[in-house]
Amino acid sequence: MYDVIIIGAGPAGISASLYVKRANKSVLVLYSGESQLEKAHLIDNYYGFPNGISGKQLFEDGIAQAEALGVEVKKEEALHVSMNAEMRWDVATTEGSYEAGALIISTGNKKLKPNIKGIEAFEGKGVSYCAICDGFFYRKKAVAVIGSGDYALSEAADLENIVEKLTVLTNGKPAPNGCKYNVIEKKIKEIKGDERVGCVEFEDGESLEVNGVFVAEGVAGGADFAKKIGIATEGDTIKTDSHMATNVPGVFACGNVTGGLLQVCKAVYEGAEAGLSAVNFLKEK
């Protein structure tokens, strides 16, 4: 059990963890291992590095700084967030489950949209990005989940007791380990239908009749968590006030997931604000 759980170990999440820990609160940082920052070859516009620094080095140094202070950092993909009977947050990961009094979402903007013809055309007409949000509309119907990782399995689990037929489509990738659902590993050519989704067509010419398609590529992004627990979003970003608080008490967001200027300096500032706000929330709780 922790005071604060932070999902995401980029500049925003790590900055938040430093302020939470310095306030003598227990904090756990979870991250999937995928970082947009690590892909940056050189960052030469951040204070204190006259010769620049690679994104990979800055990412690793940030985690090292947090761990040196006593922050617990775990490389575990967060899959699901919910509130328990004690009004605390449960975060389920690929390895287990953790509990905290406050939650900070700093995942970046990770939503992956496969390059499949028809996805955008049928958004809101059978193509969805949230099983918990929209699964109810597909009671006793046939649906497909597009994805090949643990997040796809998590979305499938949210659907299995609602829908009549469930198929995981990996779009040419190997099936995820431990998958108990019907799987098709073929490359997808197109999502087709009239006014709504009617089928998924594969590159070999065969097709699968479905009423809905749930896109769950990659790992869960901040907006994915947000929608499942009632946090206000705008597109793929989370809406916050000036103190990085969302509309759900005890949940804060910072960094790229809030939109706006996508820079390290902004992420670090918002992380500090979110960390302090989480501490103040716990004091007043």
What are these model-predicted stretches?
Residues 38-40, 115-120, 136-138, 174-181:
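Short loop/helix-cap segments at secondary-structure boundaries that form the rim of catalytic
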